[in-house]
């Protein structure tokens, strides 16, 4: 149980775009109808945090702003109408479009319908690193166009053999989204899973399910040639671009066969040639978005079993020391690392 002994909490606020973060004492929010109050034991760090700090993000409309778009903790109170969760439940959540729902603070209010109820074996640190990267991979893989690649889910009838023998390419395999995309491709039965990464990360990605790891430094022409050597006459109808910059989007369109689909994690900066039948799609990985809600309810009923069974392995997590005091430095570190997630523990903040 998570009793509240104070009416205030420690939070990390961004006064304005381009400013440095500041620790402040603010009121603990209250759960409204359909919401839960969460004692926030861990918060995940993501590129969107430093991008918001540096140049802004359209979802963050109020300043001073609390950032942090994923976290995990214990339900401390439930609002009216919440029946499927109770005080003491362990959950993870995605940060929503208001200060009270973001994770760089000690207490968070979030919609109950989109909370991930955690398996007993999963730590808060691991869980806090899931909602952004894992959901981007899940939605981008399973939702039909224009929101995803439309690949069969592993919990559907024949879903694990629907793509048997087919090739798929995942650009940016060492990224957290890429690691999950590789594993989801393996669960879908793809016979050839090609990814790009630094050669030193090949063992990690092969353990997750990649059959071929190509050097990420290859030119688009060289990369396309290597993919063609591997796939032969088989069409590449699915490419997951987990990097999402203009160069990788161009590479993805060069690799994908006519009539195929490219899924990218950032808005497309390039277009498919007219008449090619190729599609370039953009994933917005939030279950609470109207276009994802029906799928989200189905997914939340099965997601934990994917980890409990060992079908999916969570990304490596590194806990940043200092609680919320460590966020500013950690966001700089985030720009230079790959293959793991950074999390902070808000209740370890010294004030």
Explain the meaning of each model-derived region.
Residues 1-21, 34, 56, 151-161, ...:
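Eukaryotic N-terminal targeting leaders
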Residues 130-218:
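Mid-domain Rossmann-like dinucleotide-binding core that forms the NAD(H)/NADP(H) cofactor-binding site
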Residues 10-11, 89-90, 261:
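Residue-level marker of beta-strand positions
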Residues 27-45, 54-100, 114, 119-122:
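Glycine-rich beta-strand-centered segment in the early N-terminal region that forms part
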Residues 5, 85-86, 256:
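Short, well-ordered loop/turn sites that connect or cap secondary structure elements
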Residues 125-128:
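C-terminal boundary of histidine-terminating zinc-finger modules
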Residues 3, 291-351:
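C-terminal hydrophobic helical "lid"/dimerization subdomain
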Residues 158-164, 212-289:
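Glycine-rich cofactor phosphate-binding loops and adjacent beta1-alpha1 units
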């Amino acid at each position: 149980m998570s009793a509240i002994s104070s009416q205030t909490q420690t939070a990390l606020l961004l006064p304005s775009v381009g400013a440095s973060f500041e620790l402040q004492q603010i009121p603990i929010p209250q759960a409204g109808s359909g919401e839960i109050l969460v004692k926030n034991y861990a918060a995940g760090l993501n590129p969107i945090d430093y991008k918001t700090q540096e140049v802004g993000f359209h979802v963050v409309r109020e300043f001073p702003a609390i950032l942090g778009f994923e976290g995990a903790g214990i339900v401390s109170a439930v609002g009216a109408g919440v029946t499927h969760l109770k005080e003491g439940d362990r959950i993870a959540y995605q940060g929503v479009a208001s200060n009270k729902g973001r994770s760089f603070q000690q207490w968070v209010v979030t919609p109950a319908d989109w909370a991930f109820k955690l398996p007993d074996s999963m730590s808060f640190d691991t869980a806090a690193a899931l909602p952004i990267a894992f959901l981007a991979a899940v939605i981008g893989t399973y939702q039909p166009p224009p929101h995803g690649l439309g690949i069969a889910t592993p919990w559907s009838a024949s879903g694990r053999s629907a793509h048997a023998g087919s090739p798929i390419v995942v650009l940016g395999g060492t990224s957290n989204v890429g690691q999950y995309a590789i594993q989801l491709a393996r669960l879908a039965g793809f016979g050839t899973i090609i990814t790009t990464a630094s050669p030193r990360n090949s063992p990690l990605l092969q353990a997750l399910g990649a059959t071929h790891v190509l050097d990420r430094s290859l030119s688009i022409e060289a990369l396309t040639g290597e993919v063609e050597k591997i796939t032969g006459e088989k069409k590449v109808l699915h490419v997951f671009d987990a990097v999402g910059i203009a160069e990788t989007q161009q590479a993805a369109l060069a690799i994908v066969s006519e009539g195929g689909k490219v899924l990218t994690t950032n808005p497309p900066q390039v277009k498919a040639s007219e008449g090619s039948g190729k599609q370039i799609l953009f994933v917005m990985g939030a279950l609470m978005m109207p276009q994802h809600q029906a799928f989200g309810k189905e997914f939340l009923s099965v997601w934990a079993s994917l980890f409990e069974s060992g079908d999916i392995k969570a990304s490596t997590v590194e806990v940043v020391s200092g609680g919320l005091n460590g966020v500013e430095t950690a966001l700089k570190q985030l720009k230079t690392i790959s293959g793991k997630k950074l999390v902070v523990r808000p209740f370890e903040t010294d004030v």
